[in-house]
Amino acid sequence: MHSLATAAPVPAALAQVDREKIYQWINELSSPDTRENALLELSKKRESVPDLAPMLWHSFGTIAALLQEIVNIYPSINPPTLTAHQSNRVCNALALLQCVASHPETRSAFLAAHIPLFLYPFLHTVSKTRPFEYLRLTSLGVIGALVKTDEQEVINFLLTTEIIPLCLRIMESGSELSKTVATFILQKILLDDTGLAYICQTYERFSHVAMILGKMVLQLSKEPSARLLKHVVRCYLRLSDNPRAREALRQCLPDQLKDTTFAQVLKDDTTTKRWLAQLVKNLQEGQVTDPRGIPLPPQ
């Protein structure tokens, strides 16, 4: 373990005086009296300090302090009494953990320490109040930052946890923003070959995913969101790469994806339109047509 002063080379863009402030705030995380302000300042600066993640990870007591912030609000989850102030404070701690999760030098250690599991109680919450919604969204952001790296070790880790059912529940009943991030996480898991195989391994897993995606399509036909629809279509398209899932989707793909329901929403989105066309094509291929022009399922 090295001292903060030698944690990393100084980026040219960051003035020395700012570096000193960063070191000071990191040291202040260790003390409960100075932690709240340090969390706020560091979370504001995290985008402009490229090596903040290694500094947080390797400095004495810092990760323990961030985990303490998380554990401290567990009692406010059930019964749900979380205040806006509590939510803002813990979300600043989560923002710093997201920084650690997405940095190539600290990601593996972050996973090896099973730190994402500390966030799962927040994803289990169902209260619709703003403090809880913000808490769920920020927690999803940490997992989203992990999957965005497209690293095999991330998917392997997540598949050993309950992240898929947690995401599916949020996809069904969260706010539009939370649904979007949760669907993005599922999409990233599906795009990995191991993730696709895992979800299609049993009928129960596949049917749970297909059921939630189907409900989302129905909801989107009433309250359209191009961004959310894009992720839903990509999930369906990826599922159609698996032969067994493709067979099942021929029966259960929502009609709204086969007719003109979303034509207006997607009129300027060439990527999603292409994915949708490919999905329909994938489901048609391999079907035998009888003389009356009716597609027959393969024998």
UniProtKB/Swiss-Prot annotation:
Coiled-coil regions listed: none
GO biological process: mRNA catabolic process; negative regulation of intracellular estrogen receptor signaling pathway; negative regulation of translation; regulatory ncRNA-mediated gene silencing
One GO cellular component, as annotated: P-body
Cross-referenced Gene3D superfamilies: Leucine-rich Repeat Variant
Molecular function GO labels: transcription coactivator activity
TM regions (residue ranges): none
Function: Component of the CCR4-NOT complex which is one of the major cellular mRNA deadenylases and is linked to various cellular processes including bulk mRNA degradation, miRNA-mediated repression, translational repression during translational initiation and general transcription regulation. Additional complex functions may be a consequence of its influence on mRNA expression. Involved in down-regulation of MYB- and JUN-dependent transcription. Enhances ligand-dependent transcriptional activity of nuclear hormone receptors. May play a role in cell differentiation.
PANTHER family found in the cross-reference section: CCR4-NOT TRANSCRIPTION COMPLEX SUBUNIT 9
Family membership: Belongs to the CNOT9 family.
Name of protein: CCR4-NOT transcription complex subunit 9
Organism: Xenopus laevis (African clawed frog)
Top-level taxonomy: Eukaryota, Metazoa, Chordata, Craniata, Vertebrata
